[in-house]
Structure formats: structure tokens, C-alpha cells
């Protein structure tokens, strides 16, 4: 393991924990801890929503799909971009307005209970149970991804890597609450976008350019250049339907609730969609031209 890599990872992890400690002293009440006191700017709102949404999938899952399936995998990107835009356009601002005016609801279950005047609290309980159940699995997958990264990078045992990663994430989350989570996601979003811009450019340069890359792919497997190859109309609809998930993902919706003013939502939407489009295009390019790179290097 090269020393610069170790130093970089250590500095990153220390920064995450430091953010948690900083916001520990900036947190005054439950609203601050759960929703950041509704004081987030449009930039942090947008990038934290994007980073928490895409997470490791943008760096591993989507490139992997493009690598194995070819350009047909871009259908899922279209669905995600359209779904995210509609979510920002139709859900974000009304949700910010309603949650603030309906007894200052600071969670999704609170909002539903207040919005529909549920005096039995049944709606609040059911919503909370659903979120707890499914997001336990969702969060677990993120922790597993982090452990796999530590395992490969630092040659740690998987169980040790899982414990280290979990302790770091849980530490800054419990120390700084929502503000810490949002600001760490903001930093991660910047790093993700930079990596997904630089990496495909390096790969394309290494293989001799876009045209050369396309020729390498065409000679190895022409079907990877066919946007409908190996799928069907139902298959394409299924890929496009991924974008429907945006309308019900609590970790994205709470970002809309926490922006400091609803009038800043349009700016946040512009920042968020710009980040998403650039990052997804970079992710697609990594997987697609990564296939050409592997062939050109003779890697098995």
C-alpha cells in the first residue's frame, strides 16, 4: 500500500469525524439534530441529496452495468435523470412549504400525520416502520460497500473493515446529526463528480481517443454499441422506471425540507441536476470506455 493513498484516506476519515464534532457544538435542539434547523443553502442541499442518492452505486454499479451490457445501460440513466428532475420540480418546493407550516414537521412520518390530521397516529407509526425496515437494509448495503472498499484498499479482514467503516460513519452521524451528514455528503458529492470527470478523460486519452475506443469495442462485441440490444420494450420501461423511486425516498425528501427558504429551491434544482447529469455521464463513460481499456491492455 502506497503511503500517499493511506494518508489521503486517513485525512478524509479524520475530516468526516471533525465535521461531526464541529456540528455537535452547533446543535441546540431536536430540529437542529434531525433537520439542520432548516438552514442549509442550495449548494449543500443539492449535492448532499445527489451524493446520498447515488452513493457507491454511481461509482461501482452503473459503470459495472455499462461494462457488462454496453450502451443499453444508458436507459437507466435517462430514467434517473427524468425522475430526479420531476422530483425537484414538483415535490421539492411544496414539501418544504407544507412541512414548515404544518406544525414544523421535521420528519416524513410527522409530515404525513400532520398533513392528513391523523389523530390516531397510525399513519405516523406505519410510515416510520416502513422506513425503518427498508432503510435498515439500504443502510446495511452502504456499510457493506464501504467495508469492501477498505478490504481492497487496506487489505483488512472484511469484518475489521466493516467495523472501522461503521464506527466512523456512526460517529459523525450521532455527533453532528443532520448537519454533519449533509456536509459530509456535500464533500463526497464534490469528490465523486471530480473523479467521474477526470477518470473517463484519462481512460479515453490512454486508449487513443473516443473513435479508437469505439473501434475497440465494435471489434470485440458490436452489440455493446446497440442501445436496444439484448433487451425488450418491457426491459427498457423497467430501466426507465428506476426514476420513479425518487418520489418516495426519505433520505432525498428530507433534503428538500431542510433548505433555508423555499425560494432557493430553483437554484438548488439547477445545481443538483447539473451535478447529476455530469456525474452520470462520467459514470457511463467509465464503464463503457473501461471495457475498451481492459481489452487494449489485455487484462483478463
Predicted regions and their residues:
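Helix-loop-helix module between adjacent transmembrane segments
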Residues: 75-173, 241-245, 279, 287, ...
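Membrane-interface "cap" regions at the ends of multi-pass membrane proteins
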Residues: 1-60, 173-176, 189, 195-201, ...
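Interfacial loop-to-helix junctions that mark the boundaries of transmembrane helices
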Residues: 1-8, 68-79, 150-160, 221-240
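Residue-level recognition of transmembrane alpha-helices
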Residues: 9, 49, 77-80, 162-166, ...
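Hydrophobic alpha-helical segments and their helix-loop junctions in multi-pass secondary transporters
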Residues: 19-26, 92, 139-147, 151-164, ...
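Residue-level recognition of pore/gate-forming positions within transmembrane alpha-helices
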Residues: 13-16, 52-53, 80-84, 131-132, ...
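Membrane-interface helix-loop-helix modules in multi-pass membrane proteins
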Residues: 35-104, 234-245, 252-258, 262-297
